[in-house]
Amino acid sequence: PTSPLVFVPSSPRLSPFMHPPSHHYLETTSTPVYRSSVSSSQQQLSREDQCGTSDDSYSVGESGAGAGAGAGGFEMAKEMRFCAVCSDYASGYDYGVWSCEGCKAFFKRSIQGHNDYMCPATNQCTIDRNRRKSCQACRLRKCYQVGMMKGGVRKDRGRVLRRDKRRTGTSDKASKDLEHRTAPPQDRRKHSSSSSSAGGGGKSSIIGMSPDQVLLLLQGAEPPVLCSRQKLSRPYTEVTMMTLLTSMADKELVHMIAWAKKLPGFLQLSLHDQVQLLESSWLEVLMIGLIWRSIHCPGKLIFAQDLILDRSEGDCVEGMAEIFDMLLATTSRFRMLKLKTEEFVCLKAIILLNSGAFSFCTGTMEPLHDGAAVQNMLDTITDALIHHISQSGCSAQQQSRRQAHLLLLLSHIRHMSNKGMEHLYSMKCKNKVPLYDLLLEMLDAHRIHRPDRPAESWSQADREPPYTTSNNNNSSSSSGGGDGGPSSAGSGSGPRVNHESLSRAPTGPGVLQYGGPRSDCTHIL
């Protein structure tokens, strides 16, 4: 009788998946490209190693015994990686992400040399396999957006098996853990602080970072360009225009919070300080982002990829044309200065941190819990801005002038923000447009922080249009529905008011409330 283990001509029943790894079968010229003629040492490799060895040889590991013929193809397809930047086939894991050879080399050239990439369009170019070379500025921006970092480069350039690397990493981690447990307490604290600073992101300490590291983290934290997705026909009316703008603002606020959490050192601040900084500067941050998107389109304001407005379209809303004019003028000034990406991300972070670094009006704004930490972050980012300007090759006098010109423009953005806040509040009082929960929280918080009126009058003022005064304090206390009015908020916790006393109907818990009677926002920050 014929033994079942002898070599027989190939048939549909015979395949490497039907036999143990030690059994082989003969191939004829008509058989497929499945070959199992590999050594026993190669059979011990993981699936991940096998996929990268050869296309015409395929060995079956222990997990492959008894599987169907389609399982091997599925495993091979599952291990296929694509470049995070251009979606081409990835050649390896470089600079912190899976990338192809082209994008890896491009990012390496960009971070090693001095680059002044400028987008000829609107900073929204599509970067894919066919168009990745069309715009260097957008390609580099996408590299940062997907998480490519200078610190993510592999120091080993040899072709080392991933299995050995994993084993080495495991043993190194075990030895570090043992060293950490046996080290004295003071050395343990130093080790933990250095580990956190190397991790990057909002939890890392900004102290001790080089200016180049700070710039890389700031660029990597930038949010994506959003789409409005509102199907409203032109010409816009007052209601449709405000609906478009408030809807986009609410979407951007969510991404703004995510952006702030990625800033180095931000998550080390107390929750109170995080919320206060965001509440005090949210519209300025959104405006400088709008200016940056519109910098290469004279006469246009790019609110979203599918929402581009010109000055004339602002006439449909009373008071909007004036704000559009100020935005276009500031954008033109930044265009004249040829604002660079590194300068933009620094200015944006400075706006956030400078909003609460100094409490000029302690009667209307609670002081920060850790003002020194915020000031250190502000100083470090300012130093990064100065460092980048110093690399431009200009004279010291020209560098000082450029720094002054950039920082002076922040006062114009603050002025536009105040104008925009008053306009948005007037639209709210007129009930012209529905406002969303997050946008309402930010708007109400800004009204509380404002120093131009006493805190006791806010509850009454929130029910009246701006520029109208009311001295009726009884209405302020009665609108709170008991002892939750402004009078009780002034003792101990600063001039915080109960959100139940605000004019809008309750729409669930606020997402950025803090202090006293205001709800917790830890589920957002």
From Swiss-Prot:
Q: Where does this protein reside within or beyond the cell?
A: Nucleus
Keyword Zinc-finger in annotation: yes
State where composition is biased (Low complexity). Answer: 36-45
**Subunit description:** Binds DNA as a homodimer. Can form a heterodimer with ER-beta.
Q: Where is the composition biased (Basic and acidic residues)?
A: 154-182, 452-465
GO cellular-component term (any): nucleus
Q: Give the record's keywords alphabetically.
A: DNA-binding, Lipid-binding, Metal-binding, Nucleus, Receptor, Steroid-binding, Transcription, Transcription regulation, Zinc, Zinc-finger
According to the UniProt entry, the note on domains is:
Composed of three domains: a modulating N-terminal domain, a DNA-binding domain and a C-terminal ligand-binding domain.
- Tell me the domain of life: Eukaryota
Provide the protein name: Estrogen receptor
Q: What is the first-listed, main subcellular location in coarse terms?
A: nucleus
Taxonomic lineage is: Eukaryota, Metazoa, Chordata, Craniata, Vertebrata
Summary of the function given for this chain in its UniProt record = The steroid hormones and their receptors are involved in the regulation of eukaryotic gene expression and affect cellular proliferation and differentiation in target tissues.
Could you say which protein family the record assigns here? Belongs to the nuclear hormone receptor family. NR3 subfamily.
Could you tell me which residues form the DNA-binding region?
Answer: 83-148
Stretches the record annotates as Disordered: 1-59, 154-203, 452-525
Q: Which SMART domains match?
A: HOLI, ZnF_C4
Q: Where is the NR LBD domain?
A: 210-446
Q: Which organism is it from?
A: Micropogonias undulatus (Atlantic croaker)
PANTHER family named among the record's database cross-references: KNIRPS-RELATED PROTEIN-RELATED (PTHR48092)
Q: Which InterPro entries match?
A: Est_rcpt/est-rel_rcp, Estr_rcpt_N, NHR-like_dom_sf, Nucl_hrmn_rcpt_lig-bd, Nuclear_hormone_rcpt_NR3, Nuclear_hrmn_rcpt, Znf_hrmn_rcpt, Znf_NHR/GATA
Q: Where is this region: Hinge?
A: 149-209
Is Mitochondrion found in the keyword set? no
Q: Which residue intervals are annotated with compositional bias (Gly residues) in the record?
A: 479-493
Q: Where are the zinc fingers (NR C4-type)?
A: 83-103, 119-143
Which residue stretches belong to region Modulating? 1-82
